[in-house]
């Protein structure tokens, strides 16, 4: 009997250990982005669960989006984001991916837009470490290295592990783009390897501002204008500026920022017609300046007629115009956490 027990107990223990190992392996295979993000931010599985909770379907998708953006895989970002989800972080990454692929303006009204919060993540004393860690991505891609470095430093400081390859690698990249070889070597020594200097990093170098200026952290418009002045070919920064104006419903600022030779987009045509209608002029020169087509003008007249006939009731039959800037301009409101508009 004792001999049998000596055989059964080790066998049962081995079986239990095997089942446990298979459970954890299965979880890692089921949630690969969760565990990859843990490694990228210097967290073991226990710390990851403590600070970010257990892995689940929604967090796996969001972490996958963050990792794809960090690697510059914009097709994957667009594949993983969905217009059916009202999530500010998803909108932030979706907009950035569209800007990197040159289609921000054309896609803006087809996705959930929480006003300017879908373009930039503001950081204050209430911001979570996770959001802080993502806040610098847009500035890095647009070429605002001072803001990108500040965000990376904050992310490192507020990270639960106070380290992480993701943040150190980004700081190395920023200093490589800025041409600070001494700082690059410092981060390479900490990382223990040399980051890959890909062509996209050389392209970002052409976007960086040649002069710096004092500005408030939330003064996005001034910083975008500085980037555009430094490099007028920075199309992503220009689209971000124009889309910022439009999401804030600042039509006058949009017209001023658009200039005499702004880019062509159906979104910009729609916004221009609101301005032209409000100013009481639709001269052919102005229509040409904003690249307004006959179809856009015809649909604007139809939208205005339906809207005025219903005296502003949002239940009016305007479904076919739901993805236009006119609809956003008339009906979009920002609801805060306390329910106020």
Short names for language-model regions:
Residues 47-213, 236-247:
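Soluble catalytic regions of membrane-associated enzymes that act on cell-envelope
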Residues 1, 23-42, 61, 65-73, ...:
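Ser/Thr/Asn(+Pro)-rich, low-complexity disordered segments
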Residues 12, 339-340:
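Polar low-complexity intrinsically disordered regions
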Residues 1-56, 62-65, 95, 198, ...:
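Hydrophobic/aromatic interaction determinants used to assemble and anchor large protein complexes
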